[in-house]
Every structure is written in C-alpha cells, then in structure tokens.
C-alpha cells in the first residue's frame, strides 16, 4: 500500500508552514 495520504498531508503541512511562516 502506497502511503499517498500521508505524503500529501506532509506536503500540505509544509506548504502551510511556509505560507504562514510559523515553522
């Protein structure tokens, strides 16, 4: 099983972190 959901969730979190600059 490919952890597609986990991969997408991690990418979305990274984008949100970069956009909000709350890293």
Curated annotation (Swiss-Prot):
Question: Do you know which InterPro entries this protein is assigned to?
Answer: Antimicrobial_frog_1 (IPR012520)
Q: Which Pfam families match?
A: Antimicrobial_1
Localisation:
Secreted
Q: Does the keyword Disulfide bond apply?
A: yes
In the record, biological process GO terms are: defense response to bacterium; killing of cells of another organism
Name the cystine pairs. 17-23
Question: Has keyword rRNA processing?
Answer: no
| Protein name in the entry | Brevinin-1Eb
Q: Which organism is it from?
A: Pelophylax lessonae
């Amino acid at each position: 099983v490919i952890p597609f959901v986990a991969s997408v969730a991690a990418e979305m979190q990274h984008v949100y972190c970069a956009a909000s600059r709350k890293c």
